[in-house]
Design a protein with these regions (language model features):
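Domain-level signal for soluble alpha/beta catalytic cores
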Residues: 1-289
Length: 289
C-alpha cells in the first residue's frame, strides 16, 4: 500500500494542528533543576524558561504533551524547538546545544506520532528569533541592526537540517513578525530540504498580525507578506496566521489571506488579550466552535 504523505492528506481534508506547548509545560511546575538536568551548565544564566532544553533534560514532559494532543485527535504535532537556533539560545549561553535540541526534539515527536495507527505528522517549529532585521532595537540609531541576514540564514539552516534529520514532515516557520526574518528562515528551510534530499518535506509559514488592518509588526499587510513568502521556495505549501489577537479578531485577516493566496491556509490563534480581571474570555469550547 502506498504511504499516505502529508501532501496527499492535505489535498483531501482539513488537518488539525496541536495546541500550545508553553502553557502545557507550565502545568508541570518545573524548577531550574528540571531545565539543568545533567547538562552541567554553569555559565551564570538561569535556564528556567528555556523550554527547548526540556527535550534533553525532561523528554518525558514533552513526550506526554505530544501524546495528549495526538490522543485528542491532532493530525500534526509541533516540536519543542521554537527558540532552538543559535541566536535565541545565545541569550542562555546554550548555543552549543542547538544541533542536539533540534535532532532530539524532532526524533521524540516522530516516535510519539508513529505510535498511532492513522497517519500523524510532525512539524519542526522554527520561531522568529529574538532579533529582527526590519526594525532596529536601538532608538538612538534606527539604522543599526542587531543581526545580519547571513547570520539569520546560517542559524536557521543549522536548525532546519537537524529537524529534517530527526524525522519531521513539515518545517513550520511560525510567529513571523518580520518578512525579512521569514525569508531567511524559508531560504534556510529550502536549502536544508534540498541538501537532505527530502523533497517530500513541506514548508508551512505562519505570520502574526498585530492590528485589525492585518499588519505585521514590521508594518507589512498580510497580502504583501503572502506574496513575498510564496515565491521564496517551491516547498511552501501553506501560509497562515497564528497567535495574534484571539479567535474573533483573527477571522477578518484570515478571510483576506484566503481570498488572496492560492496556497493552503492555516490558522492557530491564541486566547487573545486578558480582560480587566486578568482572565481570558476565550474558552476551549468557544475556540473549538
Amino acid at each position: 500500500m502506498e504511504k499516505t504523505t502529508f501532501r496527499n492528506l492535505l489535498e483531501k481534508r482539513v488537518l488539525l494542528l496541536d495546541g500550545a506547548m508553553g502553557t502545557e509545560i507550565q502545568k508541570f511546575g518545573l524548577s531550574e533543576a528540571d531545565f539543568q538536568g545533567n547538562l552541567n551548565i554553569n555559565n551564570g544564566h538561569e535556564l528556567k524558561g528555556n523550554n527547548d532544553l526540556l527535550v534533553l533534560t525532561r523528554p518525558d514532559v514533552i513526550e506526554s504533551i505530544h501524546r495528549s494532543y495526538l490522543a485528542a485527535g491532532a493530525d500534526i504535532i509541533t516540536t519543542c524547538t521554537f527558540n532552538a537556533q543559535a541566536i535565541s539560545q545565545a541569550d542562555y549561553g546554550t548555543e552549543n546545544l542547538v544541533k542536539r535540541i533540534n535532532f532530539e526534539g524532532a526524533k521524540l515527536a516522530r516516535k510519539v506520532a508513529d505510535e498511532f495507527p492513522q497517519p500523524r505528522f510532525v512539524a519542526g517549529t522554527m520561531g522568529p528569533t529574538t532579533r529582527l532585521l526590519s526594525i532596529s532595537d536601538d532608538a538612538e540609531h534606527p539604522e543599526k541592526r542587531a543581526i545580519t541576514y547571513d547570520q539569520l540564514l546560517e542559524a536557521y539552516k543549522e536548525q532546519a537540517l537537524q529537524l529534517i534529520e530527526g524525522g519531521v514532515d513539515i518545517l513550520l516557520v511560525e510567529t513571523c513578525l518580520d518578512p525579512i526574518n521569514a525569508k531567511a528562515a524559508i531560504a534556510a528551510a529550502n536549502n536544508a530540504i534540498e541538501l537532505s534530499g527530502r523533497a517530500e518535506v513541506s514548508i508551512m509559514v505562519s505570520a502574526t498580525v498585530t492590528d485589525s488592518n492585518a499588519r505585521l509588526l514590521s508594518g507589512q499587510n498580510i497580502e504583501a507578506f503572502a506574496e513575498a513568502v510564496a515565491s521564496c521556495s517551491k516547498y511552501v505549501d501553506i501560509i497562515g496566521l497564528n497567535c495574534s489577537m484571539g479567535v474573533e479578531a483573527m477571522l477578518p485577516p484570515l478571510r483576506r489571506l484566503a481570498e488572496y493566496t492560492s496556497k493552503y491556509v492555516s490558522v492557530h490563534p491564541n486566547a487573545g488579550l486578558p480582560n480587566q480581571m486578568g482572565q481570558y474570555d476565550a474558552s476551549p469550547e468557544k475556540m473549538a466552535t
